[in-house]
UniProtKB/Swiss-Prot annotation:
Pathway entry: Nucleotide-sugar biosynthesis; CMP-3-deoxy-D-manno-octulosonate biosynthesis; CMP-3-deoxy-D-manno-octulosonate from 3-deoxy-D-manno-octulosonate and CTP: step 1/1; Bacterial outer membrane biogenesis; lipopolysaccharide biosynthesis
GO biological process: CMP-keto-3-deoxy-D-manno-octulosonic acid biosynthetic process; lipopolysaccharide biosynthetic process
Keywords: Cytoplasm, Lipopolysaccharide biosynthesis, Nucleotidyltransferase, Transferase
Family statement: Belongs to the KdsB family.
Function comment: Activates KDO (a required 8-carbon sugar) for incorporation into bacterial lipopolysaccharide in Gram-negative bacteria.
Pfam families: CTP_transf_3 (PF02348)
GO cellular component, one term: cytosol
Enzyme Commission code: 2.7.7.38
Keyword Disulfide bond recorded: no
Subcellular location: Cytoplasm
Organism of origin: Prosthecochloris aestuarii (strain DSM 271 / SK 413)
Signal peptide span: none
This protein's name: 3-deoxy-manno-octulosonate cytidylyltransferase
Gene: kdsB
Length: 249
């Protein structure tokens, strides 16, 4: 295949409902969004990392670090709509959607989600999944942990906050997967995302990836064995701070 241009887009907003201003929360001397950007910079397959935000405060912090920033509308209904707007004036073949609250993202996972686009017959979109084991029973029933089921070609059939698949008699954990919210999109697919508008299942589950599923786009799921915590709550933030301190000690 000919070389392709790949750009990482990081959506970032201040008005998080569960942890306000989390993007600027300090993690060992740097804001959370800066830590995520630093990890993204280590990807070996991308040529640019861009912050997409509607916050002048976030924009100022990131520009001071030397990051590329695109200002977006405050009306975006989800992170993918925000990066779709940012992508309108960026020349790339593939865009990676990396959530801004992932300061411990493994750069290898970023490269892993890109790899389906370096092969023949690339999908419309790709994402990562992590296998749930027997001791992860609680995770299967946690609505804050998104589960996914796939077909025989590892394409997503459905995502849900409910247990997937439902176990009628036994807990077959070896075939249960949690979804990791990083995506790569063909440029044309990303640009069509906002045009479709929120779908019925997307609104029911509050999962933006279901907009793609309902509209017939393929989402290739790539399994990873590295799953680091994101930051959605104050408890998550304290855990990430402890992990950063342990790395430095």
């Amino acid at each position: 295949m000919p070389p392709i241009n790949i750009v990482i887009l990081i959506p970032a907003r201040l008005n998080s409902s569960r942890l306000p201003n989390k993007m600027l929360a300090d993690i060992e001397g740097a804001p959370l969004i800066v830590r995520t950007w630093q990890q993204a910079q280590q990807s070996s397959l991308t040529r640019q990392v861009v912050i997409a935000t509607d916050s002048e405060e976030i924009a100022g912090v990131m520009k001071a670090c030397g990051a590329d920033v695109v200002m977006t509308s405050p009306d975006a209904r989800c992170g993918t709509e925000r990066i779709a707007e940012a992508a309108e004036n960026i020349d790339a073949d593939v865009f990676v959607n990396l959530q801004g609250d992932e300061p411990l993202i493994d750069p290898g996972n970023i490269d892993l989600v890109i790899k389906p686009f370096l092969q023949e017959n690339p999908p419309d979109c790709s994402t990562l999944v992590y296998r749930l084991l027997a001791e992860d029973y609680a995770a299967l029933h946690d609505p804050n942990i998104v589960k996914v089921v796939m077909d025989s070609q590892s394409n997503a059939l459905y995502f849900s906050r409910s247990p997937l698949p439902y176990q009628r008699e036994t807990y077959a954990a070896t075939r249960c997967f949690r979804h990791i919210g990083i995506y790569a999109f063909r440029a044309g697919v990303l640009r069509m995302f906002s045009e479709h508008g929120p779908s019925m299942l997307e609104e029911a589950e509050s999962l933006e990836q279901l907009r793609l599923v309902e509209n017939g786009y393929s989402i290739r799921c790539v399994e990873t064995d590295v799953d680091m915590p994101g930051v959605n709550t104050h408890e998550d933030l304290e855990l990430v701070r402890r992990l950063y301190r342990s790395r430095r000690s």
